[in-house]
Amino acid sequence: NAEQSSKLITPLINGTTYYFRVGAVDTSKNVSPLTLEANASPIKGAVYTVKTDTSGDYSDIQSAINATQDIDTVLIYPGTYQGGINYTGKKIVVGSLFLTTGDTAYIDSTIIDGDASSSVATFISGEDSTAVLTGLTLTNGYTTITGGGGIRIENSSPRLKNLKILNSVANVGGGGISCEACDSRITDVVIANNSVTGIGGGMRMFNGSNPELLGVTVSNNTSTLNGGGIAYEGLPASTIEQRLHRVTVSGNRSSEGVGGGIYLYSSIATVTRSFIQDNAASLKGGGLSIEWASELTLENSFVSGNALTNGVQ
């Protein structure tokens, strides 16, 4: 009956995907060997749809964001949308139909193109973990003065998940992502083919940042200076521990610096169940460069095939 087959689960977080396995139990408490797996993502508040034609609430993403209030959702249908977006401090969820279906094909088919004129996504107004960006491809961002060709985060901590951040450029730091004073949780994100003339081809974390990386792939990014893949720049005598779990750092290059894969400067990092492979640096530390009182713990991880020092400096 309905009472026995219904289950109220609370509290749930807006924009978070929950996974369930449903089975049957008979009157003798025997559990059926057959189960049904399902996933769901709760959506609170109003939902604003964005479509490339005129059939949605809006045809451009920023207009939809501007119309939202806290806890609302912007649901983006497949297509390519030109121009960067800015959350402007709002506690909202922005995502593709991946958000409602769990179908990863929507990540590839729903694209925000930065027009090589700005960061593709910007979080600089104190956004916290209730600001979520999910299920999208971000590409063709470009910044000259600030970092973060793909995503710029400053004094904010949005949640980033199930994204692809591709082919973006920065002149300062963080071709893919620049994270300044942020504590973001970054999950199942691909950061690839980005570049920077400064530090951190894929990602740059600095000024007290402490993001958590889970299931992140950082590949084929390039930097002129240090950290072709990822650059961590801690504050002097920093005790903040950077956490990387199930991360793949591969094929990244530092053309005139150190740390082709990962560069640590005055930083503490723990890397677990990860791969650091086939990266290269022109000076030293093809896979990893650890400088200025940095500490690194590697657990159940592989470091191999890196150029110059074949791994750790």
Residues covered by each model-derived region:
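Recognizes extended acidic, P/S/T-rich segments that occur
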Residues: 1-15, 27-35
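Hydrophobic beta-strand segments within extracellular beta-sandwich modules
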Residues: 20-21
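The right-handed parallel beta-helix/beta-solenoid scaffold, focusing on the short coil/turn
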Residues: 46, 72, 83, 90-92, ...
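N-terminal extracellular ligand-recognition/capping segment immediately after the signal peptide
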Residues: 53-58, 62, 70-93, 97-99
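Right-handed parallel beta-helix/beta-spiral solenoid domain characteristic of secreted/periplasmic
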Residues: 54, 91-146
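Right-handed parallel beta-helix
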Residues: 73, 95-96, 109, 130-140, ...
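Extracellular beta-strand/beta-solenoid scaffold signature
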Residues: 109-124, 144-152, 170-179, 196-206, ...
